[in-house]
Each structure stands twice: as structure tokens, then as C-alpha cells.
Amino acid sequence: MSWAALLGLLAVLLLLLLLLSRRRARRPGEPPLDLGSIPWLGHALEFGKDAASFLTRMKEKHGDIFTVLVGGRYVTVLLDPHSYDTVVWDLRTRLDFHPYAIFLMERIFDLQLPNFNPSEEKARMKPTLMHKDLQALTEAMYTNLRTVLLGDSTEGGSGWQEKGLLEFSYSSLLSAGYLTLYGVEASPRTHESQALDRDHSADVFRTFRQLDLMLPKLARGSLSVGDKDHACSVKSRLWKLLSPAGLASRADRSSWLESYLRHLEEMGVSEDMQARALVLQLWATQGNMGPTAFWLLLFLLKNPEALDAVHAELKRIVWQAEKPVLQMTALPQKILDSMPVLDSVLNETLRLTAAPFITREVMADLALPMADRREFSLRRGDRLLLFPFLSPQKDPEIYTEPEVFKYNRFLNPDGSEKKDFYKDGKRLKNYNMPWGAGHNQCLGKSYAINSIKQFVVLLLTHFDLELVSEDTEVPEFDLSRYGFGLMQPEEDVPIRYRTRL
């Protein structure tokens, strides 16, 4: 062996010795500490492979709070839903989401914003997603869903068409959402302009979907060389599609878009970075609705009793409406708010499939009080992680048969919404958390709920829809998606649909 090789081996051994000597020890008052068997990496491989299974094992071993080593970072995991409010409402000087958000923004979307303040941005965006602006968004979304769904069905004729359910749901909702937020070809609309809208928004979806499929690897920095080249190409295409100059001529742009672009200009953001910011916002506002609709429709198609209950509710609404749903140019908020069965189906779908990580950076050494009066010390520089998918959403103490879809789980016997769920004999405030919580709860929650419900109503009132094979099983999750919002399936589910005559 050459001297160079020996010196290299010695350097590696010294580095390993250094890493081993720096292995952290648990201090009094801290959560249980699990370092794993590999220096520095710790549990990174297990966590990345299947976060839910890994964290379930850790909970069984250590209880509802513990610290694990993951790729050089110490992550304290809290799985007691009674104690979540302590975290999500804490001061940013103690527990802050912003550093992690900025890290993902730069790593996934190549986006750098000067003096970026997520709290200020949310405050600017909030009015454009609520109240009167929410009504305008909801009405525009209904119009654009009709353009995407009914225009395509007219062009395709009245016969059966086959497609993957995820592709169908995702493409329909993202295309309509893009037109709603970023504008349409012309106003007033014509048959020609609507056809152009369908083609253009479909192009946006196809390109976006390529980026979406790479998102977990982008976030973890694990793309191959070939994938990196492909990611760069896809991002460049999206930046061109969503450039401020390209969007300037579009009609009926949302107040959200106008406000957000003004905000970016006031910050002195270049047009190139503005385009990247708009790609980020396309993912943030539209990336979860399509997968949600996929799971919801699949659960309905696999559960005839649930589908019958939703159909019965829609018939009641049609009977009570001032004019037929088929003739409505918009679904009034009053109608959208009077669908308790569909609301329960949506909540149950989200309970089973929404799996975001709620993360905070620990900004100072602090004591974290638990709901049961215990208190644990957290160290500055660590990361705190909540995973509501495990608890409360999949907790057998809170939900009987938590792995089973029950369409009426969130309904009381009198048909009203059920909100009373318990753990350890105490009523839970946070019993289902697909939208996050506290300072970082999703601003677009109402817009997303309205959009998904409108999509389901249009689909069930205008189309016949069925599985290609009745024996189709509910697919397994793509395990790499844990932490990024709605889970996606490992494979799509073939369906057939046709316009109802």
C-alpha cells in the first residue's frame, strides 16, 4: 500500500474517531436520545426510506417525545397532540419555521428573496384568500373547472374514456387553479379562447408534474446527475411559462396574483426571481388539491355506501336549489357550506392521507412544557418536528380502526359535524391536522376546500365514473412523499368516465 493510501486511510479513521468522540449524550431533563448505529448519519436512512414506520418504532420504544440523530441534525419528535399548541403558537424567537422554509425554498425552487419575511408575506396574502376575494376565487374556480372538465368532455364525445384517476384529478384541478390565479387567455371568453386555455393550462400541468415527481429528491439533495439536468430543464420551462412578462397579457388575473407581484416588486426582486417565486406559489397553492381529490374519489368508488350517501346529499341540494345545478354558473357558498356528508368524506380522506411534517428550528435553549405537566429541555440549533399523521390521525385511541375509511366518521347521529374526539380521557383540540396549525396554518384552506368540493360536485352531476376493474386495490403510498403534504400513490388507478346524457 502506498504512503498516500495509508495517509488517506489514517485521515478517514481520524475523522471517524472525531465523529464518535462528538456523539451527543443525553442531559438530565432532555427527551430520550436515540443516535442509531452509524456515526453522523444516525437514523437518516431509515427516516428517508419510510418516516412513518420509523417514527412509529421510535414512539413504541421511547414514548411520545424523543430526539433522534438524522444526517448530522438532532431532531426532537413530539407525538402528543394535546401538547401541539405549545409548539405551534410559541414565539418565533424560541421556535421558528422560517429558517427551514427558506432552506427548502432555495433547495427545491432555486429561489432567493432579499430580506424575505414569511410572516410579512402571509399577512399580505391573507386578505386575497379570504372574505370577498375568496368568493371571487371560488366563482372563478367553478368557471374554470367547467372549462377544463366540460370542454374536454364535449371534445371527447359522449363515449367512455379511460384515464388514470390521479392524472385526471390532478390535471383538472391544477389546470383550473392555474387559470383562476394566473389568468385566462381572454375576457369575455369565447370557444376559441377556452380551447387555448385548456391547451395552455395542460402544458403547465405536464411541466409542473415533472417537477413534482422529483420534489422529494430535490428536498433531500439526492438527485442523480441525469436527474439534476432534467430538473434544471423542467424548472427553466416553468420559469418561462410563469414569467411576469408572459403573464402580463392574461385576462381576469386574481387579486392574489396582483398583490403578490406588487409585494415582490416592492422587495426589489428581479423578474427572473419573480418567475421562480410564482412556480413556488403554484406548488404551494395547487400541489395538494389533485392528490386529495384522487384519494377522495377512490374511497368513494371503493365504498358504494359512501358514494350513495354523497349522491343522496347532492340530490337534496339540487331539490332545494333555486335553479338546477347544471345551469349554475357558480356554486353559492351557502350550497358549499351545506354538504355535511361530503365534508365528512373530505375530512376522513385527509385524516388517512395528509402527512406533512410541522417543523420548528429551536432558536434558544428552552424548556418545552407538555400538557401532562412534564417538561423537557430542548437545545438551541436542534429541530422540533410534529407528525400529526401518526397522532392524532392514525391513533387507535382516538379513532377506532384508524386504517379503515369510514365516510361518516366526522358526522354526529343528527347529521351535524362531529368535533368531539378524545385521548387519555381528555377532549382534543387538534384531532385532524391536514392544514397545519398555529402561526403557519394554510392560508388557502377555504379556497382549497371549496375547489375540491366543486370538482366533486361537477364530476358526480355531469359524469358517469367507475373503476376499470372492480377488483382494483387501493394503492400503497409513495413513501418518499412523507413530510410534503398529501401522500401520492405508488401507481395510478385506471378509471373510465363519460358525459352523462
UniProtKB/Swiss-Prot annotation:
Regions crossing the membrane = 1-21
User: Which GO terms fall under biological process for this protein?
Assistant: apoptotic signaling pathway; cellular response to estradiol stimulus; cellular response to hypoxia; cellular response to interleukin-1; cellular response to interleukin-6; cellular response to tumor necrosis factor; decidualization; embryo implantation
Q: Name one GO cellular component term.
A: caveola
Catalyses which reaction?
A: prostaglandin H2 = prostaglandin I2; a hydroperoxyeicosatetraenoate = an oxoeicosatetraenoate + H2O; (15S)-hydroperoxy-(5Z,8Z,11Z,13E)-eicosatetraenoate = 15-oxo-(5Z,8Z,11Z,13E)-eicosatetraenoate + H2O; (15S)-hydroperoxy-(5Z,8Z,11Z,13E)-eicosatetraenoate + AH2 = (15S)-hydroxy-(5Z,8Z,11Z,13E)-eicosatetraenoate + A + H2O
Q: Name one GO molecular function term.
A: oxidoreductase activity, acting on paired donors, with incorporation or reduction of molecular oxygen
Q: Where in the cell is it found?
A: Endoplasmic reticulum membrane
Q: Which UniProt keywords apply?
A: Endoplasmic reticulum, Fatty acid biosynthesis, Fatty acid metabolism, Heme, Iron, Isomerase, Lipid biosynthesis, Lipid metabolism, Lyase, Membrane, Metal-binding, Prostaglandin biosynthesis, Prostaglandin metabolism, Transmembrane, Transmembrane helix
In this chain, substrate is annotated as bound at 107, 113, 288, 359-360, 383
Q: Which SUPFAM superfamilies match?
A: Cytochrome P450
Query: Chief localization class?
Result: endoplasmic reticulum
The cofactors it requires, by name, are: heme
Gene3D superfamilies, alphabetized: Cytochrome P450
Q: Which Pfam families match?
A: p450 (PF00067)
UniProt-listed Enzyme Commission number(s): 5.3.99.4, 4.2.1.152
Q: How does it sit in the membrane?
A: Single-pass membrane protein
Q: List ligand-binding residues for heme.
A: 442
Q: What does this protein do?
A: Catalyzes the biosynthesis and metabolism of eicosanoids. Catalyzes the isomerization of prostaglandin H2 to prostacyclin (= prostaglandin I2), a potent mediator of vasodilation and inhibitor of platelet aggregation. Additionally, displays dehydratase activity, toward hydroperoxyeicosatetraenoates (HPETEs), especially toward (15S)-hydroperoxy-(5Z,8Z,11Z,13E)-eicosatetraenoate (15(S)-HPETE).
Q: Which family does it belong to?
A: Belongs to the cytochrome P450 family.
Protein name (database record): Prostacyclin synthase
